[in-house]
């Protein structure tokens, strides 16, 4: 928590005295330096910088009362509470122990101060004001024993200058644990419960603890909800838990190749029956790859469960959509190919003046190379009806590269007229009625004859332009 970062430990006390002392200390710092009142320890003060600002002169007297020498203390953030000895007017010791209680061996900064200077190990040095020290060595040893017991405990009131009665009576000590414990677990109501929640979740499911670590202290209910929701979601989504992968290399192999066949059995159990596998595999691979880092033992962690659920939902919708689009595309493909076949038959026969025709059964023969080559290329792209036409032309004696064939002869005017009349009859009567192309072609053209007749009657003699535009659109 931010408020515990670099704040002294005495700010954690909830009593109003300490709050008053913490605020008033910093407010009245300079004021107390210049002012000498007739109270004990009035100039005793925290001094948080290391500029050696000490009172090295003799004992001050204001009126006829003693004052404690201005003993400033420089301490680090967690050095504990370090107190010096001071005496009252009668010379009796007050309840303040004269030893430093810091856990890091922080001794009192008394660089030439008139009071007694005492190191943390109990060695005793008399400086200028030896008369000011009235302790016997036995008392010092007793205090040393006490300090070993109470070494890391804090006095609640650290500033007797702000509370004049504090010097005349012993203040009860209030232990709050070691300073390291204070910094790691500050004494607030939220912190222990938060640590406890995370510990519980991490025993049940490490992935849930990973997600709960990001929730703030006010969202503990959410953290518990995650841990309680996980089993029900797990049962709903994965009815039969898949066996964990034997090697972690299986995940890496699946990441390297996103092929539909490379699905492992456990992932197929988690992702139910993928129909169009290629899209969800990439998502699932990304999802599953996060899983072994967090919990390789659990079959499907909750992160994967949620995203696999998403992929399942999206896959159902995309299946419906893709099936609809696929059927629509097939229907359009068949319609376009059928109309294209009709146009192509007419175009081939109308432009037959440029192509030689051998007199086999009076049917159409060789084509020119310029017409045959695009037809061969389109045959790979277009549907089965065009392949049927291609097979028909081959059976009638057509060759793919007929320029090397010596039997190809140019068409005459009579043959061209006969070709036009036959195509007109085909358009009016249908493909089969007058006996033209009856024997071989009737079985091949029969599946799409009815639709093709209507389309051919609608489009009179638009031949090459429509077919090329259709081809460009579908290539």
Curated annotation (Swiss-Prot):
Record PTM Phosphothreonine, positions in chain: 300
Entry GO terms, CC: nucleus
Residue span of region Disordered: 92-115, 160-191, 237-271, 292-318, 456-475
Record-level Gene Ontology MF annotations: DNA binding; RNA binding
GTP-binding found in the keyword field: no
Subcellular location: Nucleus
Role of this protein: Possible transcription factor.
Family: Belongs to the vasculin family.
Name of the protein this chain belongs to: Vasculin-like protein 1
Protein species of origin: Rattus norvegicus
């Amino acid at each position: 928590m931010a408020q515990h970062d670099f704040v002294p430990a005495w700010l954690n006390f909830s009593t109003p005295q300490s709050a008053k002392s913490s605020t008033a200390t910093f407010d009245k710092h300079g004021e107390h330096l210049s002012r000498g009142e007739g109270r004990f320890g009035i100039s005793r003060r925290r001094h948080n910088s290391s500029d050696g600002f000490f009172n090295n002169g003799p004992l001050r007297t204001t009126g006829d009362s003693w004052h404690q020498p201005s003993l400033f203390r420089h301490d680090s953030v967690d050095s504990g509470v370090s107190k010096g000895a001071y005496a009252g007017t009668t010379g009796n010791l007050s309840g303040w122990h004269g030893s430093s209680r810091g856990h890091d061996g922080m001794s009192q900064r008394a660089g030439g101060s008139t009071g007694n200077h005492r190191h943390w190990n109990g060695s005793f040095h008399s400086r200028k004001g030896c008369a000011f020290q009235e302790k016997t060595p036995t008392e010092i040893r007793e205090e040393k024993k006490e300090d070993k017991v109470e070494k890391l405990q804090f006095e609640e009131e650290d500033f007797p200058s702000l509370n004049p009665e504090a010097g005349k009576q012993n203040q009860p000590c209030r232990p709050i644990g070691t300073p390291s414990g204070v910094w790691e677990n500050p004494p607030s109501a939220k912190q222990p419960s938060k640590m406890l929640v995370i510990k519980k979740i991490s025993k049940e499911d490490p992935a849930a603890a990973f997600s709960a670590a990001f929730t703030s202290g006010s969202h503990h209910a959410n953290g518990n909800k995650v841990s309680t929701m996980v089993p029900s979601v797990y049962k709903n989504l994965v009815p039969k838990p898949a066996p964990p992968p034997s090697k972690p290399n299986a995940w890496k192999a699946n990441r390297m190749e996103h092929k539909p066949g490379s699905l492992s059995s456990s992932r197929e159990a988690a992702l139910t029956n993928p129909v169009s596998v290629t899209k969800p595999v990439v998502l699932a691979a990304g999802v599953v790859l996060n899983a072994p880092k967090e919990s390789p033992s659990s079959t499907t962690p909750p992160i994967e469960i949620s995203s696999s659920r998403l992929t399942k939902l999206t896959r159902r919708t995309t299946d419906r959509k893709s099936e609809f689009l696929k059927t629509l595309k097939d229907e359009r493909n068949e319609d376009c190919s059928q109309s294209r076949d009709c146009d192509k038959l007419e175009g081939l026969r109308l432009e037959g003046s440029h192509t030689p025709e051998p007199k086999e059964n009076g049917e159409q023969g060789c084509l020119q190379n310029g017409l045959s080559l695009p037809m061969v290329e389109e045959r790979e792209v277009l549907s089965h009806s065009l392949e049927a036409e291609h097979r028909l032309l081959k059976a009638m004696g057509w060759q793919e590269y007929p320029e090397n064939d010596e039997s190809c002869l140019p068409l005459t005017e009579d043959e061209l007229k006969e070709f036009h009349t036959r195509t007109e009859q085909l358009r009016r009567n249908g493909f089969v009625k007058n006996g033209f192309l009856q024997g071989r072609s009737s079985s091949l053209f029969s599946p799409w004859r009815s639709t093709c007749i209507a389309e051919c009657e609608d489009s009179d003699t638009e031949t090459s332009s429509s077919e090329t535009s259709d081809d460009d659109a579908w290539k």
